């Protein structure tokens, strides 16, 4: 492809709204343009990258036995109401009304639609298993679209759905897809982690995320270098047995005056006691209005995702000052004793002795509190946020933390959707049973951004070879020089004949502008045709490591054959 005939609108400066490297460089290098907040146009270079990513995904989906389909973007509200997700998704779900007053969802996912297709067309165990996938535009009404392709209101996804006759068979389908995902991300050339994850609004029994490691990513991951355990912080566990304090003999309960002292740090200083022996009592309001108290050790943070999952809630929030007042609870001095709401405790509190809690009276705390002598929680639950240094739940070695971008997510759904939508099959004994499902997503457009976040420098993008828009970039530094033009044209012709995807910069612009654009665009290999042709030389450059090498023109064939 000749640059003079292509469309590469590069920019010297990034737009003011571009904050992260992928947003900055994809716009500056002419891969995308913004139409509105969270909406992007894919220009020729960007579209080529998308097609490369989609091609790799299709290859391994097909190899895994998945069948490609294309489902409508719009889904009737009735389908989403059958599963209850019309309300669960809340404001993030785009809802549209047609001229007849009928409501539809602009699909962020397609569980309802694909399950409806299956329930209408598959009735016998002989028709199972099946696995369908599509690459389709999705929609999510983000409150604050940001970071370019990372968090948009419109995005491209590959979503797949497996249908099996039993959980045992569904697990096999899940494992097949998990292995296919590993192959996809390996071939994409990305540094990623497969991590245990929360099932979220999709629901299901368990799930894994595929996270590309990047600084300041939205996904927070804890992982173990020793055994390979990795989990999203929302789902991560730690070995709490190794985080206990030594046992103590119980001391008499005592109420102490703590004027104006309410935070863990202040109580620790005032009473001269380790923060691990101070227990926070947090009052939460669940989405149905239920108030619950949750105890957690003073040095640990509560994981609201675990809380929501335990109570099977849609959402929760910390009680406000007004809500605490309505409950008759004294803000700043909340404790478990004497509360009129259910009290639950994190596992960090289970074997704690002689600890401190609020006395539910202004300016007072209890010390030397012990369970079950002084109160008894309804249940002990893992509500803690795992963090760096915690013992690994598998091998007990210290955990590490990193950040990244979620680019893939797989779920073993079980029968959540098939039961809600009455997608049943008849087994070999003539009994009707719900189909067991799995679902598997990959953010195609987000992968483009993730690759740039992980692979760039101060000059621009450094594309992994398998998804680069072109493999070779030929720069003719002075296209008006007949010798330079002749050599560059000859190399361009040879590269095309060898089946190499090549971009030939034949524009009549300065060498400096060509080099800047080449660095911005980030094509893996570069042949620079300049003044060296007078000595029978051209320069070979590698974008990834910046390595430069001058070779004889008659060695070009050998170089091209190695690409």
UniProtKB/Swiss-Prot annotation:
Q: Per the UniProt entry, what is one GO biological process?
A: prolyl-tRNA aminoacylation
Q: Which InterPro entries match?
A: aa-tRNA-synt_IIb, aa-tRNA-synth_II, aa-tRNA-synth_II/BPL/LPL, Anticodon-bd, Anticodon-bd_dom_sf, Pro-tRNA-ligase_IIa, Pro-tRNA-synth_IIa_bac-type, Pro-tRNA-Synthase_IIa_type1
**Source taxon at top rank:** Bacteria
Q: Mind telling me which Pfam families this protein's record contains?
A: HGTP_anticodon, tRNA-synt_2b, tRNA_edit
Which controlled-vocabulary keywords does the entry list? Aminoacyl-tRNA synthetase, ATP-binding, Cytoplasm, Ligase, Nucleotide-binding, Protein biosynthesis
Q: For this protein, what is the EC number?
A: 6.1.1.15
Task: Cite the Gene3D superfamilies for this sequence.
Answer: Anticodon-binding domain, Bira Bifunctional Protein, Domain 2
Q: SUPFAM superfamilies this protein is in?
A: Class II aaRS ABD-related, Class II aaRS and biotin synthetases, YbaK/ProRS associated domain
Top EC class of this enzyme: ligase
Domain comment from the record reads as follows: Consists of three domains: the N-terminal catalytic domain, the editing domain and the C-terminal anticodon-binding domain.
What HAMAP family does the annotation carry?
Pro_tRNA_synth_type1
> What name does the UniProt record give this protein?
Proline--tRNA ligase
| Species the sequence originates in | Persephonella marina (strain DSM 14350 / EX-H1)
């Amino acid at each position: 492809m000749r640059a003079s005939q292509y469309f590469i609108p590069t920019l010297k400066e990034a737009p003011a709204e571009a904050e992260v490297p992928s947003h900055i460089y994809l716009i500056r290098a002419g891969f995308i343009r913004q139409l509105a907040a969270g909406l992007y146009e894919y220009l020729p270079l960007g579209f080529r990258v998308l097609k490369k990513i989609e091609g790799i995904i299709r290859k391994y989906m097909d190899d895994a036995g998945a069948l490609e389909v294309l489902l409508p973007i719009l889904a009737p509200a009735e389908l989403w109401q059958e599963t209850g997700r019309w309300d669960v998704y809340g404001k993030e779900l785009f809802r549209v009304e047609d001229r007849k007053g009928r409501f539809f969802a602009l699909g962020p996912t397609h569980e309802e639609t694909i399950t409806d297709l299956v329930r209408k067309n598959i009735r016998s165990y002989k028709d199972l298993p099946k696995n369908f996938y599509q690459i389709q535009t999705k929609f999510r009404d983000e409150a604050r679209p940001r970071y370019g392709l990372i968090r948009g209101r419109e995005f491209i996804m590959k979503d797949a759905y497996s249908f099996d006759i039993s959980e045992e068979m569904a697990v096999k389908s899940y494992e097949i897809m998990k292995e296919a995902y590993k192959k996809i991300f390996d071939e994409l050339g990305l540094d990623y982690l497969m991590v245990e994850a929360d099932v979220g609004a999709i629901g299901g029994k368990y799930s894994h995320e595929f996270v590309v490691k990047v600084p300041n990513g939205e996904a927070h991951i804890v992982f173990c270098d020793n055994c390979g355990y990795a989990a999203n912080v929302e789902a991560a566990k730690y070995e709490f047995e190794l985080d206990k304090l030594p046992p103590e003999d119980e001391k008499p309960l005592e109420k102490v005056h703590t004027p104006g002292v309410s935070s863990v740090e202040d109580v620790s200083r005032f009473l001269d006691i380790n923060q691990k022996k101070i227990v926070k009592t947090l009052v939460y309001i669940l989405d149905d209005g239920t108030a619950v108290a949750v105890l957690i050790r003073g040095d640990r943070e509560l994981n609201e995702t675990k809380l929501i999952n335990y109570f099977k809630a849609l959402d929760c929030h910390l009680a406000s000052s007004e809500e605490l007042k309505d409950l008759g609870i004294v803000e700043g001095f909340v404790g478990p004793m004497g509360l009129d709401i259910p009290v639950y405790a994190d596992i960090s509190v289970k074997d704690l002795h002689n600890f401190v809690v609020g006395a539910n009276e202004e300016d007072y705390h209890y010390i030397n509190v012990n369970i079950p002598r002084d109160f008894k929680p309804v249940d002990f639950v893992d509500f803690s946020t795992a963090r760096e240094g915690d013992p690994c739940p598998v091998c007990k070695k210290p955990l590490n933390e990193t950040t990244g971008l979620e680019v893939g997510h797989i779920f073993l759904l079980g029968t959540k959707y098939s039961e809600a939508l009455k997608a049943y099959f008849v087994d070999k004994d003539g009994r009707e049973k719900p189909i067991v499902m799995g679902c598997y997503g990959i953010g195609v457009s987000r992968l483009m951004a993730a690759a740039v976040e992980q692979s760039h420098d101060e000059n621009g993008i450094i594309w992994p070879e398998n998804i680069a828009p072109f493999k070779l970039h030929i720069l003719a530094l002075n296209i008006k020089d007949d010798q330079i033009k002749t050599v560059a044209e000859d190399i361009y012709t040879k590269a095309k004949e060898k089946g190499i995807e090549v971009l030939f910069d034949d524009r009549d612009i300065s060498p400096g502008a060509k080099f800047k654009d080449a660095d911005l665009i980030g094509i893996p290999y570069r042949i620079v045709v300049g003044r060296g042709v007078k000595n029978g030389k051209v320069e070979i450059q590698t974008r990834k490591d910046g390595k430069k090498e001058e070779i004889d023109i008659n060695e070009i064939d050998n170089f091209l054959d190695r690409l």
